[in-house]
Amino acid sequence: MNLIFAAKSLLVTRAATGDSWHLPDSSQLQALSYQSSLIQPEGINILGSISSDVDLSPFPELSLVNLRQALNFFGIEMVEKIIHAEQMLFYQNTHRYCGSCGQPTSLSASGKWLHCSSCEHEIYPRISPAMIVAITRGDKLLMAQANHFAPEMWSVLAGFCEVGESLEQTVHREVFEEVGIKIKNVQYWGSQYWPFPNSLMIAFTAEYDSGEIVLDTNEMRAAGFFSKDEIPGRPSTHLSIASRLIDDFIAKH
């Protein structure tokens, strides 16, 4: 598996026939200048990065595709490897210098982490816990549009955990802050690592308890309860845990 990233885009090649996309083979990358990863995840042959404004005109078979879109091209096992590899590159690119003493970092003896040889500070990848919740009110699901969503995109509510909070506290706080309602019967549903930017998504289900929807307009464009036949839009990536929560609601109603 050969993975070349440019920020949050993935280098892919179009199949000879049809509209499917594949990862480039080694021969297609021989003449391409890229920066190799210090860390080499298992199962990855080539891992590297290029500039987002790189000139790919000498390589007509290659294209940069937004990572969210690219994840729709592959099965779940490959998606997990792609996410892991991209996050290891992100980790290296954002931890080039020690946060303790300011000296350049280098690869640890294990080959898996970065460390500072000057002050012996160990630097590990940042993982940001975030909740995501499917809230039902009878046979309807709460769906919302964040201000940064594309017009056709809707999803369930999500938000990052704050220092000192339990996950359950995060669920209640984020829901009330974003749409102004109270919920009950919060139950763990599942989890997924998601590289936007470095989130461990912890999914829950919950039931509406009280209140009327009042949007935090700094974050939300719209929100409402919808039956399975009224769902106004979907997340952009079908393998995301947000999509799977919506699919679970549809299957049960």
Model-derived segments and their meaning:
Residues 1-93, 150-154, 196, 216-253:
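Nudix hydrolase/Nudix homology domain
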Residues 142, 162, 232:
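Nucleotide phosphate-binding site architecture
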Residues 83-136:
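Cys/His-rich short segments
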Residues 113-155, 182-183, 206-208:
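N-terminal strand-loop-strand
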Residues 155-190, 204, 212:
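The catalytic Nudix box helix
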Residues 145-146, 158, 187-192, 217, ...:
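Active-site proximal loops enriched in glycine and acidic residues that flank catalytic Cys/His/Asp
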Residues 192-215:
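Active-site-adjacent beta-strand/loop module that shapes the phosphate/pyrophosphate-binding cleft
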